[in-house]
């Protein structure tokens, strides 16, 4: 053994770290290549920055990171022409965690001008040790720029490392991984290329891969989000969007900006013009990609709330360490501040684009149901989201907003009225709406699945309470019908008590209705309880016990109700008719009769009696 070989024990913290990295820290084994490529690319950036003040550090003309798999030798080599490391650097950066090359280098940049700063440097620190997930021995041969000496650091990750003199013709670093028996896949060029494309496609330093004896490009090499907007064409944005999302449409909106000051990040976000093939309703989490200094970290950082999960893109920050784990991300306040800033930017863009009614309508039809989830989930943004949602209406064609509705309210109208159901056309012809239409009162029609929930969290807009018209408490006496009322109103003094007794197990009340014009009956929700659509959802989910009983409302001017009132007054048995009347109300509201067989029998009997 060479007399110049030096043996050193890892610092105590490294042994613990190795075990953590190999067994717990990283969610995917392929992360090792991301870390090593990032280190190599950052070393190139570091040398490039140093050359600004020391021409002797100038990079070679074609500076690139080279990846060379060797199946015969079972090695994977990552080489770079970067700043390199000397003997002390290797010991300090790879033998302990106490010293951090990145932190030391960051201090030297503290007073540099922004346009002089390269990306903050990923260092041979925590991320480096991920190599031991796939390698049973790692050798790092490095020559520092400006020095003639090269050294090799080597370890099997079992508690010690060695340092020995080496030779390297040019400054830079070679990391050689002796692969474990179960890591054959990482010697396959196509597998390596896939990983590089996934994790490092937009690192600005070129990356090449040795495949079939030839060097091929491994990455695109341009972080589009870091380029000035003026230098990017719409075609380039669209191409990047399609590459990133695997969609084939043109983005409905492109947001590209850089934040500087308290937060330092670049963002390039897209709102698709079409709903993806896999509906966004099925995926609950935002998939905006988090990059740190151009290196992809994760698409599970929650950079946007779930109600903006249709937004795609990249956020690249310099305020996080490159080797931050997904587990650590959730605990850092930096990410929370970025999330708030990005969310505010997207909402601002939507507000601006909402001024173009036709253009906004296309967005709304694709992603409106998802955006409305925010009213239920996000108290902080609830009012802003309320201004962005759109509705069908009983009074106007196309889409309308809360603000538009308020501008059309009748002089003595105090509330915003909504009707929730499964189908807009059915809602527009619903018996629930007859009295409102007769009085010229507009009703907003809500038919998305989420519409049964969010109105519980938004009780008013612009100071106007929001009320479901299926609630029985609405008083329309202040509004005179705009047309002549047809038919004389029946006296229900005898009918109502009898119906209450007959239907006591099925309804909570029976009363005359102000809102019926053409229909004989309708069901409404009792005051203070869930509206009818929520009751339907509870029943469908097997939770009918929480739905409560409806109120049966009667139209005293309808011929059927007048006839029943006469029969009740003369003492006739109206039990069968009462049951049929209630089932008619269910059918009219879009529900099935309580007992379809019994309902059919009663209807057949009634028809036969008329024949």
Curated annotation (Swiss-Prot):
SUPFAM superfamilies: ATPase domain of HSP90 chaperone/DNA topoisomerase II/histidine kinase (SSF55874), HSP90 C-terminal domain (SSF110942), Ribosomal protein S5 domain 2-like (SSF54211). One of its GO terms (molecular function) is ATP binding. It is found in: Cytoplasm. Residues 1-326 are annotated as: A. Its main location: cytoplasm. Disulfide bonds: none annotated. CDD domains: HATPase_Hsp90-like. Residues 327-536 are annotated as: B. It holds the Pfam family HSP90. Residues 537-611 are annotated as: C. Belongs to the heat shock protein 90 family. Molecular chaperone. Has ATPase activity. This is Chaperone protein HtpG. It comes from Methylobacterium nodulans (strain LMG 21967 / CNCM I-2342 / ORS 2060).
